[in-house]
C-alpha cells in the first residue's frame, strides 16, 4: 500500500505501493519521494515496514539491476549452481532463454511489472520451498508500479545489489565465487 505524507507543501511518498507516483501527480500535482527510499542508512524511514529486511526469503538474495549486469546473470547463475541450489527470478524473455539445471531454478514472473507486483512474494516463498541457497532477481524500471516493486525487492534482498563489475569479478575467480555463494 502507498503511504503519502501530505502535511507539507509538497506531498511526499513515504512508501510506494499500488497507487503510483504518476497517478498521485495527476491528482495532487508535484509529488516527491522520501529520500529514505534510496536506502541511505543515515536517514530514518518515516513509514512502517521501511526499515528492516521485509518478507525476506530464507536464502541470500541479490537484485541485478543494470543492463550490463543482466547480460552476465545467466552465466553467474549457472556458475553459482555448481556450489548450491540457485534460483533466478526474471521476466518472460530472460526466463525463456536461461537454461535450467538440477541445481538452477528459473522462476518466470511473466511479461510485465504488474504481473511481478502480484507474484513477487509468491515467488520468494517458492524459493523457500525449493530450498535454494541463493536467489538472483532481475530488477525492473522504477516507473509506475515498478517503484513499489523495486522497493519491495530491494528490501527482501537486504538492499544487496550486484553490478556488472561485481559479477565480472566473481566470474574471474572461482574461489571468490564459491565463498560468495556459500557465505
Q: Where are the predicted features?
A:
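Active-site-adjacent structural elements in enzyme catalytic cores
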Residues: 1-183
